[in-house]
Amino acid sequence: MGKIIGIDLGTTNSCVSILENGNVKVIENAEGARTTPSIVAYANDGEILVGQSAKRQAVTNPHNTLFAVKRLIGRRFEEDVVQKDIKLVPYKIVKANNGDAWVEAAGKEMAPPQISAEVLKKMKKTAEDYLGEPVTEAVITVPAYFNDSQRQATKDAGRIAGLDVKRIINEPTAAALAYGMDKAKGDHTVIVYDLGGGTFDVSVIEIAEVDGEHQFEVLATNGDTFLGGEDFDMRLIDYLVDEFKKESGMDLKNDPLALQRLKEAAEKAKIELSSAQSTDVNLPYITADATGPKHLNVKISRAKLESLVEDLVKRTIEPCRIALKDAGIDASKIDDVILVGGQTRMPLVQKEVADFFGKEARKDVNPDEAVAMGAAIQGAVLAGDVKDVLLLDVSPLTLGIETMGGVMTALIEKNTTIPTKKSQVFSTADDNQSAVTIHVLQGERKQAAQNKSLGKFDLADIPPAPRGVPQIEVTFDIDANGILHVGAKDKATGKTQSIVIKANSGLSDEEIERMVRDAEANAEEDRKFEELAAARNQGDALVHSTRKMVADAGDKVTAEEKTAIEAAVVALEAAVKGDDKAAIDAKVEELSKVSAPVAQKMYAEQSAEQPQGGAQQAEPEAKHDDVVDAEFEEVKDNNKQ
């Protein structure tokens, strides 16, 4: 069995980790960084860029550079939070046929799981490069407050990326795993406060020693899946736009290129203000009008930034209060506060959290890496490599069905330990009713319409009977991933109907399979692109070395040889400009062939000049084609010396 990797699929950055020889290791990507920007870009030549390379070209390609897509995963286009995002991002958010929020880039409409899959593929490749073997299994983290559709969509993203997702695990729980594995024995209760790029979660977790086993039990969880560092950036961008408008009278809101530059500058300034008291945002040539180019230069103090985002920080405190209440614990009983997510580096966030919980947060947990590390530990538990850990997570939101009068009747209350299974008997609302529709809901409101609809299905062929007589047993079963399976059974006939809840939106199996095929086709395209690039490089090198050889040979080359070589060189140069690898290979072969006699002459002459040359005289025939590259690299080395 191969390794099960742990992936923190973040809104802003992602991270991959593995448990190796009993130690958790965060794996560096090809650029040498331990985290990878969750950014995917579609270049004009069709290439798909992921991570730092996508981030670098965002300013010049804002419409086709997709960031913070995790905020759209598993969401309907009509949702308020999606409508708000449409106004804030330079790329297009569109309505899919099933009503989901999709994105458009490079003229194609794509589902958020497809975009997330590109990031997951990069994480998968990072792990494979390090391990030197294929990786097919992963534990992927999600915000604790993700609903069923969002969890399912994350699992779909894993499938599209070619990963068998062994478990979906909540981010705060993963962070607690990373924190608690090496702690002293004994029971303690921790708060994980996770403020990431796009989401906020808080979980109350009890870490206990039970018969020598680490038991991690989530007592309660709460959060906001549309609050994070991106919102902090947006406040700063709005401020910079307003300041520039006051000074120049020009509005940068409608200029995607300027907005992308502002986004980069705002993120950089925000990070700097975590350690400095003030910083300058200096963007020359941000725009231009009839009078000439305009430059943006604004000085921002830490106090100013804090005043801009104070209400966002305050918004994180109410979920903390609710989580403590649901867990039945007073803030004073919390042993440790663990901060996770890059935004928790902000001094104001740390101060608010310390004030609320009455204690400073721990500084020995890396906020960017703890979640991926916890996912790797859970992967090792599932693989059987770690035996002394038991994880008891909870369902973050109440689950139920719509009953008469548009009421939501709960079957599984929020913060119920999972996996779990609950059944309840319902009946018909009308006489001789032959079918019932089971409408599955998730949320905390009493009115069904105010909650998230997860899906509907029908139980048909109910024998005619007066209302209230038929007995329909509805069963909710939540698996360890927090994904819901629902069944309904007519107790009189034994007839059953069941579904895995995949929302009335979500991706169908056919769509996922098509996206998997697309991803595989992209991988094939990437391989062909690499091979073509290698062939072009080989062609260029051969042209250069052949021309150098002819120049060095001088009058030792006959006019016929010179003409033949020049014709072959020109043909190879033309082939290198094209996209046909086979044509390049053929022209390389041709040039090697026509230049071989000259190479042999040069080699023989050089050997004759050396005292020990006699012993090597028999070699030219054996070397033949390879002689051009090898010989002239060697001459270069001699020249250097």
UniProtKB/Swiss-Prot annotation:
State what induces this protein. Answer: By stress conditions e.g. heat shock.
Q: State the source organism's domain of life.
A: Bacteria
Keywords of this protein's UniProt record, alphabetized?
ATP-binding, Chaperone, Nucleotide-binding, Phosphoprotein, Stress response
Task: PTM Phosphothreonine: list the residues.
Answer: T199
Role of this protein? Acts as a chaperone.
**Family per UniProt?**
Belongs to the heat shock protein 70 family.
> What is the protein's given name?
Chaperone protein DnaK
- Originating species: Pseudomonas putida (strain ATCC 47054 / DSM 6125 / CFBP 8728 / NCIMB 11950 / KT2440)
> Gene symbol?
dnaK
